[in-house]
């Protein structure tokens, strides 16, 4: 048996018919969604980083309930283990920052008239006369400059990964630098071709591959700005590398062109880890090759040039290097809005702006199922899904909250919860349920388990971003009290005003189904029988309140209540955190009493959560020889009131005593 902490569930709590703060500061919720931008990797994220990653304006129209709901978890103080879902045929925004360096020899012109200049054969002075007195042609007066030019239109189409763009960059270098000079001339504008004479030296270098961190439509730009004031004091050139969206600068980092420079034990070289919102990948050997060529053309030693402004042809004080100019017809990598990445798309499977909600499509459902099952159903998928979703030691998830997901996705999440056993699933019945019969139909399609609870209430709310009405399930509002409850008192009932389970955003009159008891039909009793949870209004507070908390398992036991299951799961997570700290400590013989004490110390923190909590070490020599510590934990649960029965008696007045 490997080094793991394993739990076996035994439910001996059949019901008859007659605290310390958890170690995990932020409750961790599992979710998956589409978004306008962001990484495609499964990540943990919280706070403002969520909005920096996925966008500050969350669109219900484009991405449905789940993205807004994820934002509400973040706003309530929760943490997400999440994945941005992307269409299979989406492409990656990218640009290859490519620099051309050329020795251009051209005939100088007279500044005032624009006439070409010549060298008078007799005097050696410059002249505008093409011929001397004897009608011999004068030599053209030429000047050779080293010209730096940043090339445009170096974006690669139909790429899904940065590796594909990188391969294209390497091919680009080979294609450019093996080109005969006459062929190269033909790539230039016609008016520039006559500037080139014999013995032209040139080189074209794709220095950096810049890509978005996830596939999506083009939204980002890159900018490189020289910082001469700071550089002159440091003695080497530094730049500000910026990621920009529209007119907003999202990120600035300080970098150097010199890949080997270390300052105060820190490297400021541009790498693929330089930025959080973009990948900035140096093309191997290109910066060195470019500076070597620049050194060859200018005569400045490489060791000196590498610490100068090789991007803009200046020294560290901002003065142009003698004989070096920057071609203003190239792209301006230091411009206010930077250079925009191109060739990205959202693909065709998920039409964010279409008339049909893509989040009800089979393609979307399949992509979500892939995530929640931890694998890719397409062998050639460039982004295989992460089986670390099964890692119970690293990702201590507390809950996954449904968000109007398709039925098959709800079941995929439930299967994950059944396998892990350490987090709880809050499932909705979609926004299409309006009757008791509708609820039963959805229930019949869902897997039943003690690790999931079902909720049928839906209603309209005001979209906080557009101020329009949108239809949501109660999960939209439920996440806020869930974050608070998991952080403060997960052992208490997940219902009622006293525990904060009020759904305050529901627009009155839009709720789908409010069960009542009539002479013909006891809707409240029937929902109780099938253990479907709901919310209803109470006169005393006027707010929509969650009033039941059944799990979906068939058997009626103490594990038919959400808070009892969640309380045990909290204990599991605490032990799973503590046990690895005590593994491999030498014990005396087969007596693991020291290990028992370590576990008991953890459980002592939870005694107030339960009516009874017993820890029993089951010493077994055979298991001890196999290095296995085996113990039993018995839980008895606190009671609480869900319903009230009052017996009302009418008695004779004579029986009333003073």
Residue ranges and their predicted role:
Residues 1-121, 125, 129-596, 602-623:
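A glycine- and small-residue-enriched flexible loop/hinge signal that marks low-structured segments
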Residues 390, 608-658:
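Compositionally biased, low-complexity/repeat regions
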